[in-house]
UniProtKB/Swiss-Prot annotation:
A GO cellular component entry from the record: chitin-based extracellular matrix
GO molecular function, a single term: structural constituent of chitin-based larval cuticle
PROSITE patterns: CHIT_BIND_RR_1, CHIT_BIND_RR_2
Presence of keyword Signal: yes
Annotated TM spans: none
Domain Chitin-binding type R&R: 41-110
InterPro entries named in the record: CHIT_BIND_RR_consensus (IPR031311), Cuticle_Struct_Prot (IPR050468), Insect_cuticle (IPR000618)
Signal peptide: 1-16
Gene: LCP17
Organism: Bombyx mori
Keywords associated with the record: Cuticle, Signal
Name of this protein: Larval cuticle protein LCP-17
Role played: Component of the cuticle of the larva of Bombyx mori.
Length: 143
């Protein structure tokens, strides 16, 4: 019985239609230009360009080297054409504040409704007094 199952699986694999799986030249794109520069101080810079129109570049350095919390700051960009034909052009900064991409293809947040913006401005202009906040915290702790 096990032999028949193994034989059936082997026959199914051998006769599977794989003609729809097409190999693309995208995977074999030649590198047209490439440069890398790394210094002992922690600075780096690189860029490359491929034959199918992909381009990327970045540069970075260690900030606050002698502090307790050194951080790496990287600025870069890349561009390519998406499979649906849309040109993708993205610039980014990555530092202690996180990854911050910018590009016309990225979604943008909806504008803040006017009523919410007014409420936020009012709260900022009229902060609660510290005694009110302290009383509420103590009341919550006591129960």
């Amino acid at each position: 019985m096990k032999f028949l199952i193994v034989l059936a699986v082997a026959v199914a694999c051998a006769s599977a239609d794989v003609s729809h799986i097409a190999k693309s030249d995208e995977y074999a794109a030649p590198v047209v230009k490439s440069s890398y520069d790394i210094t002992p101080e922690g600075h780096f810079q690189f860029n490359y360009e491929t034959g199918n129109g992909i381009y990327a570049q970045a540069e970075g350095a260690v900030k606050n080297v002698n502090s307790e919390y050194p951080a790496i700051e990287v600025k870069g960009a890349y561009k390519y054409t998406s499979p649906d034909g849309q040109p993708i052009d993205l610039a980014y900064v990555a530092d202690e504040n996180g990854y911050q991409p910018q590009g016309s293809h990225l979604p943008t947040p909806h504008p803040i409704p006017e009523a919410i913006a007014r409420a936020l401005a009012y709260i900022e202009a009229h902060p609660p007094s510290p005694s009110v906040v302290e009383r509420k915290v103590v009341a919550n702790l006591l129960g």
